[in-house]
Amino acid sequence: MQDLRWPTYAVRDLVLEGAAPGRDPEGRGCAYVVDTDGNEYLDGVGGIGCLPLGHAHPKWVAALAEQAGKIAVAAATFPTAPQRQFVDLLLERSVVPDGRVFLANTGTESNEAAIKIALRATKRDVIIGFERAFHGRTLGSIAMTATAAYRDPYVSCLGEPDERFARMNVARAVFDDLESVEKLFEEYGERVAAVFVEPVQGEGGIHPASKAFLLGLRRLCNEHGALLGTDEIQCGSGRTGNFDAWTTIVGDDPKDAPDMAWYAKALGGGFPIAACVAKAGIAEHMSKGSHGSTFGGNPLASAAGLATLQIMDEENLFDAAADQLPTLHEIVAERPHRRVAEVRGLGAMLGIEISGEGEPAAPLGDILQDEGLFVTVCKGKTLRLLLPYRADETILRDAWARIRRGLDKLSA
């Protein structure tokens, strides 16, 4: 069957059918899928981090079905019961103290909301971002994104700190290098509105920031009157063992908290919902009509998000997620492979760096699909695994066995 979408994706040579029959006997969400030819795969992509519960968790499915029978969409001027409940739970969990929320649909939308509120609240025009960063592909977000291939075709619309083509300008520092951030503050001074950081870089290759670095960003922003925003789109919503990756790395002291944090991906358990949370004193700088979203926080999405947060609590999924990286370290140590340079990450955000010149991991997406495992490859060097939070030792051993076979093929 011909794929008639724009050629913006490296489309896999298969058509997915659904969750694999018999692979979820306890009814807690499935880590395996089948295609229309009946082939089974362990899904280590998970919609790129969107499936914390796995596929077809019965309680999540039931919550969506029940809400679909009531009301699916309402204009944002009409609050709904699931939206109110979802927002209450979200703000209880978010690292941002005394938060107020803007609801959207996708990660890049929540990042755009963060850009708008940072510029509006500070009346400044420079945002500091980082090398290897990924924040989305809409124009504001792509200005923050470090990948030149994504950004450069649109540079005339984006601007740089001394090219006044745009109202927002991006200065880029080195990730986990506080001195490089200090130099940008020295250069741009009171023009700096905010620093945007991923506590764990995902697209950039699964790189966690250090506690000292994140606390240093907090200090610099305090000293210069800038806002600190954390992009929790991929690393947040429980994936690292706490609701926010910031909390996993830094802790939960309110004085260290960021001013803003934004979420998507895992937040809806597989249904699109996103949120940008800002401190109340920052959020008050927005006014009626200053931002909006037709579908943001719609009843279906809110029901999905609410069910996801409730299931995470009921099934202790944050604790389960936290166990994944140490478990994988043990498994790889038992049966190492010479092509593995490093296993790193945080919680259920797993990266396996492959040794070799150039982009040694690039062929592994196709090779591992033939082995019955879906992965993504970051920067040509690192395999990224974003499994359901409850993926246990058995599933991780299965993943590693398939990866070892793939590495043997790569090395042949």
What is the predicted role of each segment?
Residues 1-412:
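Conserved N-terminal phosphate-binding loop of PLP-dependent enzymes in the Aspartate aminotransferase
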